[in-house]
Design a protein with these regions (language model features):
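Rossmann-like flavin
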Residues: 85-197
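N-terminal Rossmann-fold NAD(P) dinucleotide-binding loop
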Residues: 13-14
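Helical element adjacent to the flavin cofactor pocket in flavoenzyme catalytic cores
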Residues: 173-227, 231
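Glycine-rich FAD pyrophosphate-binding loop
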Residues: 22-40
Length: 404
């Protein structure tokens, strides 16, 4: 039995801890236990890459029109400039085509894990009935239909009139709708509780501390240094939204922080959508909760801060109101959130090039639950079997370390 320290408490951290605990390893999960937002919408099927043809031009136009999946505010930060250069290179049709195949491949494997977990813990409500994709512009809906293969089992063209009641509060100015039939959703709070419960049963230890440094000797990490103590282990896995630990060691993960807002609304039962909604032309997502919805805005990179900018939220809500069947938003709660975003749509997963007992499981963006459950097992095998990154075809395929 070896001792393994997992730094972070998001789903990439918890699934990695669980896979290692199942293999009989001694697990230490260290995090500052911040209440960070995690998306329960899983869309690995029929979803384009963030870096794709036209992404750059639409992102800069988005600064004016507020209609872009990624708002880019230029800044002089060297890490951002490097990220931006690589993101620009990857924004091609060929990259998008390849990533769609990889999203599907690894999404299926994560779904298998979540399916099994749902059998044991049905309260996580892993629902594979699909996700609505709603269009507010005729042009974008027509373009999507033109790109759709005949008899595509992964997406269903819906009759807006017959489905309207299922859309909940989104019931105006809808030009078209699809059901992305193979995508899914889950209750993230219940999923987290289930994972923590399993880890407790397996003897994992949870420590509330903020790790700010990894101390090394030679080509190995000796200990993780936190505000409240130091923690020794045989292996360390960084699975948080922290870039400082890797940058202090001279490792560039080709990732930056991206900002987005969540807006929580309290609604009556008939106003809650029957399943998650993606608003195609606003690049927003709507996630049903027990007493309302959580709305997830598009991502912002570059010159960002931690503040809640009410003018941005108000502009977003003013546009959203075109689609709402309610005149007043009751008890709205706003929050600024952050995710690590790679420049090539791939997470940073695998061993550090220099420090062989240090591994990363980071930078999934908003897609953590679509892929982290599977890659937790891939990393666990690397640690348990003493393998290198090159021994894993899946890491070579899907890690940002192996794509410029």
């Amino acid at each position: 039995m070896s001792k393994i320290a997992i730094i972070g408490d998001g789903f990439s951290a918890l699934f990695t801890a669980l896979e290692l605990a199942k293999k009989g390893e001694e697990i230490l999960v260290i995090s500052n236990q911040k209440d960070e937002f995690e998306s329960g919408i899983l869309t690995p099927f029929n979803t384009p890459a963030l870096a794709r043809d036209g992404a750059i031009s639409s992102s800069f136009l988005g600064l004016v029109s507020k209609k872009s999946e990624l708002d880019i505010a230029l800044c002089l930060n060297e890490n951002f400039r490097a990220w931006m250069a690589n993101f620009t290179l990857k924004s091609t049709k060929a990259h998008d085509k390849k990533m769609r195949v990889l999203f599907k491949k690894f999404g299926q494997k994560s779904f298998e894990i979540l399916r099994e977990l749902n059998e044991k813990h049905p309260q996580i409500n892993f629902d594979e009935s699909g996700v609505y994709l709603i269009f507010s512009e005729d042009e974008s809906f027509k373009k999507r239909l033109d790109e759709t293969r005949v008899a595509d089992s992964e997406q269903e063209i819906l009759s807006v009139d017959s489905e309207l009641a299922n859309f909940g509060l989104i019931n105006k100015n809808i030009k078209g709708a699809l059901n992305l039939a193979k995508n899914a959703s889950t209750d993230v709070k219940e999923l987290r509780n289930a994972l923590v419960s399993e880890l407790n049963e397996l003897g994992a230890q949870f420590i509330n501390d903020e790790i700010y440094e990894l101390k090394t000797q030679g080509q190995a990490v000796q200990k993780a240094v936190g505000r409240a103590g130091e923690y020794e282990a045989d292996s360390f896995v960084v699975a948080s939204r922290n870039l400082e630990l890797s940058s202090k060691l001279g490792t560039n993960l080709s990732a930056i922080l991206a900002k987005f807002y969540t807006i929580d609304l309290v609604l009556s039962e008939d106003q809650i959508p029957k399943k998650p909604i993606i608003l195609n032309d606003m690049f927003a997502k709507i996630y049903p909760t027990k007493n309302g919805v959580t709305i997830i805005t598009n991502l912002q990179v570059g010159a960002i801060d931690t503040l809640v900018k009410t003018e941005k939220i108000n502009a977003f809500l003013n546009e959203l109101k075109r689609h709402l069947g309610i005149s007043e938003l009751k008890e709205p709660r706003f929050r600024a959130n952050f995710v690590l975003l790679s420049s090539n749509d791939k997470p940073a997963i695998g061993r550090d090039e220099t420090y062989q007992n240090l591994l990363y499981n980071q930078a999934y963006g908003l897609n953590e639950l679509s892929f982290a459950p599977h890659f937790a097992g891939v990393l666990a095998d690397l640690i348990k079997d003493g393998k290198s990154n090159e021994d894993s075809d899946e890491i070579l395929l899907f890690s940002s370390f192996y794509e410029g």
